[in-house]
Regions:
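Short glycine-rich phosphate-binding loop at a beta-alpha junction
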Residues: 2-4
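Long, low-complexity, Lys/Arg-enriched
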Residues: 9-319
Length: 319
């Protein structure tokens, strides 16, 4: 965009109208002008002046905004900002913003449990961000955390479901919903699924029992008739166990996790699960508050003996 000859008002208006187009700006000036130096440039004395792409500077503030959104678990919004930067910054700045955009897309997909797709995007971003991290401490810390996350992600993908690793991922996801977004109904829904997954994984790994298709002879005789009556599907005749029945079977088989569940069930879990069942994302109309989530979260870590340090953390962006 050439704004030669424009008044100050015209030049500012032109810049404002074109800034979103990622334009470069030029101006024809010169060392010698008519009218004692205040008129037009004398023929043959013209000089072209080129200004840098303004988006190279605008992107710095956009990057900060994207970092804030990412740290609040608003991954899609952060990705939209970075995608805009990729399209508009100068060529030499594109690799960094493109890699950052790929990384954010990867974590957005992971947050939706799309692990295979997340892995592809995170690996695409890793090498470029590693190179930038050699000169930028903030980027280096992001890469270090991403490497740790990728190691965990690889294990999730390698391990058949249900698994204890998948449970850890659900717990971390619930923690993000509650701690970063304050979406306690969503958090409790994920937390409930993590409690269920724990039982499913323990029954599968320790006793070879699939809760979606339990074999009759794997059910202790004391529970067999009741389980056939209550949990056998009329459509396909498979025995399918919900959360409570899974833990009851686990306890009856001598599983430590099942015993731990029932040690706190009456006093802690039962009233909390009742509130969950009446929540808007389950079977009722009541919203869940922070206190209920935290109690259920703490009780889950308590009976499962899962320490906070085992819950993965996504990177914190300070770019």
């Amino acid at each position: 965009v050439d704004y030669t000859g424009g008044t100050k008002t015209m030049s500012v208006a032109l810049a404002m109208a074109t800034v979103d187009k990622s334009c470069c700006y030029s101006y024809v000036g010169g060392d010698e002008r008519s009218k004692g130096g205040v008129g037009i440039v004398i023929d043959g004395k013209e000089k072209m002046h080129f200004l840098e792409n303004p988006w190279d500077q605008i992107a710095l503030s956009e990057k900060k905004e994207a970092s804030i959104l990412f740290n609040k678990a608003r991954y899609d919004s952060a990705g939209d900002i970075l995608e805009k930067c990729v399209e508009r910054v100068s060529r030499e700045h594109k690799p960094f913003f493109k890699a950052l955009h790929e990384m954010v897309l990867g974590y957005a997909l992971w947050d939706r449990f799309k692990h295979s797709e997340a892995k592809k995007h995170l690996y695409r971003s890793r090498d470029v961000l590693t190179a930038f991290g050699s000169e930028n401490e903030a980027v280096k810390k992001v890469v270090e955390q991403m490497e740790e996350n990728l190691s965990f992600l690889e294990k999730i993908l390698e391990t058949p479901k249900p698994s204890h690793l998948y449970c850890l991922d659900l717990l971390a996801n619930a923690q993000r919903r509650a701690g970063l977004e304050h979406k306690y109904d969503d958090a409790v829904a994920r937390l409930y699924r993590s409690i269920e997954t724990l039982a499913q994984a323990e029954l599968k790994e320790s006793f070879g029992i699939d809760t979606s298709n339990v074999k009759v002879d794997s059910i202790p005789e004391r529970l067999r008739e009741e389980y056939l009556r209550n949990y056998q599907s009329k459509e396909d005749h498979r025995i399918k166990l919900p959360l409570y029945a899974s833990y009851r079977l686990l306890s009856e088989l001598g599983g430590k996790l099942g015993k731990g569940f029932f040690e706190i069930y009456e006093k802690e879990f039962k009233p909390l699960l009742s509130i969950r069942n009446n929540s808007i994302l389950a079977h009722g109309f009541n919203p869940v508050d922070e206190g209920i989530f935290q109690k259920l979260f703490d009780s889950t870590l308590k009976f499962s003996e899962i320490g906070h340090e085992r819950l993965l953390k996504f990177p914190t962006l300070n770019l």
